Each structure stands twice: as structure tokens, then as C-alpha cells.
Amino acid sequence: MVISDQRFRPKDKTEYLAWLEQNEQAMLAQFIESKGKLTTELKGLKDRLQEMNRQSQDLLQPYYQAQRRYFEHLYYNDRDTWIVLDPVISVHPDEIFFECFSEDESSYGKLSCSHNVFTNVGEKACGTTNIDYSDGLYQEFQKIRSYKRTTLAIDPGGFAVKTGDDAGFDEKKIDLPESWVRGFLQVSSAMTLPMASVQLHPMDVHNICFLLRRRKERVGPRSLRYLLTPGEPVRVTLDPWNIEIVCARSIYSGPEPRQIRVWGRRRLHILERLIPVARGFTLHLLGDGMPSFYVAELGDMSFTLGLSGWTANDWSRLGNFDLLAPRGNVDEFTLRRVYTALAENWCESAPSLARRLHTDEAVVKSALAVYSQKGQVLYDLAGGVYRIRELSREPLPLEQLRFSSEREAKADNFINAKLVKVESQERTAEGVRIAGSVLDNAVKYQASIVVDDDQRLRDAGCECFFWKQNRLRKGPCEHMLALRRAS
């Protein structure tokens, strides 16, 4: 202890500085001499690289030619395979937004960019177009940097992007595949359904993704369980390891406790690149095995990730959430009046439209739901407003799109044949509970539904096999739909 001295003493660099002063000129001359040698070596390496690139191009040319012939064959003989849910670009008075689906059609993404993001906004006209998201366009997006000037050009014929002094890339508009349209219709309808919402801190999303990266499940279940208790931190349990993450920064403020289980959790890795720049995430949950939406707040931008109930349950074929949307009887005059009022501002909330038109809010929501199912209106989950978004200049083939599932067609048949009997209607805290029976192939099925004040289906039950197997994860059965129509 007597000789112990832990005080900080800076290094004495006097000798080093003196040596550096004596040898500085010699070192500088040596550096200049080596620079010329390195420049010569670099030129030789560049020449070799160019020669190797030429040889590689010659070797791969037969492959590229065969690939081109294959894509041309798909284009002319199997157009649906050639086109896979490509992005939609919409220009609005307040923002530009891009929408797309994943290749397996189970994930939906929407990037909204306020006009404040851009230094200069030229002459613009509001509208929607769609393009083919090719590899060339993807590579051009990867060049975007904060220190480079990026130019976006959008017109009805396509989309162009140019970064810095690089040559720009122009992607042309393509035709709309049927599954592409149906996927957007289902997403628009799902966004209008009742949800449990919670604010998540970016580090909480990071912790979920981090644990999923560290572990790989070899047996089921492969689910995330969100445990929501009012006034307490959100808890997330990862199955099958039963690991619980306490999101201390994220407090649930909902009215009642909820436990919601979702699958297809590895799709959350899509959000990883946004975690460092996100100010927060808003999570919207519909229910067990139902879709979930993650909204990343990025300042003047926002990104919405919509996940179907599980990976195999894609948006365009197995999700029938348009059948759960508000279905109030709205006359044609009111429909056109609501749509015209929305088109005046291009985006507006349902309460604001109702006040402006002196109309009941439930009627406005039902009218907007009709246009959502027609592909003319989109619900913006991040802003809480409805937006004009025409998927096609021509009227969509709604009969083909609407009856991709036979359940609603069967429900229409039950109504037309007068096989539906409404036995009771009573008001509850959740809404109106309707009970009745449907005669299907000489078998009487008892069914019941609960419809809230916005005409949305909140709960339902039936005696049929479809409901016992799927509950509401694939939408209501034909007996519930018929009962709702008859009431």
C-alpha cells in the first residue's frame, strides 16, 4: 500500500515527437515513391479485372439468353407466373406511398413518404400506377444514400429512379394480375376491423428479433403470444421455449386484458433494418391466428407491415376479411356522395366525412368499406384516414374477385331460396347479437353473430364443420353470412 499510486499519468511523448521531426522528410519521400508504384499496380489490376469481366460475360451469355427466352415464354403463355404481386405507387397531395406484397403473398408492406422528405417537388398530379419490381430497380434502390441526391419520377406509364451521377433506371408499368388485386382488397378490409393496439419501443422489437435469430425451433408450436394487461408492460412469450420478454418501455393502455397468439413470426425480420431509425412501432392485433400490423414511425415517413395469420395463409387466396367488414345497406346515391366528398381532399377520416356530409358515421364507414372492396379506397392505418387509391382505370371484375371463395355465393343462394330464419336479435355491450338457423342440404344449422355499431362482425358461432375447424381465422362461414344478410 505504501508504494501504491493509482493516479492517472499521461504518456510522455517527447522522445517520439523528436524522432518524428527528424524522420518526417524521409518518410514523406518514401511515401511519394511508393505512391507511383502502387498506382502502376492498381492500373494493372483494373486491366485484369476488365478482362475477367469480359470472359465472364462470354461464358454467361448462353445462360442469359436462355433466361430471357424462359421469361418471354412465361410472359406470353403464363402471365400470372410472370407477374408476382408487384408494387403500387400512389401520389397524394400530402404524400407518396408505395405498396407491395412478398413473393409468398403472406406479407404486405406500405412505405409512406411525406412531401417534406423531398427537397424539390415538381409539378404533380394525384393518381396510382403499378410497376414490375425487377432486379435492376432493386439494385438502383440499394444505391440510395443520405449524402447522394436521389431523383424519383412517377408517371402513368411507369417509375424512374436516379441516384447521384449514376445512370438512371426506368421501370415500365405492367398489367394487374387477379391475385394481386384480391390481395389488396383483403388487406384494405382487414385494416378496418376492430383491433387491440399497443405502442412498442424499437428496442423491444429488437429483442424479439434478436431471440429469433439466436434460436431455431425444431418442434412446434412456433408462435408469439402477446400478453396485454392494462397499465402494465407488454409481455411476449416465444414458443416452444416458453421464453418471456418483458417490454418495460411499452405499456398497454387498452380497456381489458388480452392474450393474443400469432404465427409466422420470422417475417418480423423485415423490420430489422428499420429499428435503428424508427422512433417507435405501433402494433395492431386482430386476434388469435388473425392478421397483425406493425407501423414503424420514421418521422416524415412511415412503414406499415401487414402479416397474415400465418405464413401459409396468404392474403390473396385464404384470407376473406372483406366478409368481416361493415355491410350496412347503403343506397347508391349515398355511396356516390361519400366517394365524391372523399375525392375532393383525396384523404379524410370517417368522423370528419360524417360531420361534413351530416351523415351517420356508421353509414360513412359502410360506404367506404364498399369502395375498399372495389379497390377504389384504401384505409391508411398509420394516419387513421381513408385514401383514394384506384387499382384500375377500368371497373374491376368484382364478381370474379368477390366470389373467389364460394361461401358468400352460397349465402346468396340461401337468401334467394328463403332458407334463413332469424330467431332473435338482442342488444349487448359488444353490439347486436343475432341468432337464427339456416337449412343447408336438408340439415338445419344454428348460427349466431355479434355485429358492433360500425356494422363489423366482432364474434360469431355455428354448428357447421367449417367453423369448428377454423373459427374466424378464414372468415365467417356461409351460414353466418346468410344470417347477417337476412337480418
What are these regions (language model features)?
Residues 1-487:
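Long, low-complexity, compositionally biased intrinsically disordered regions
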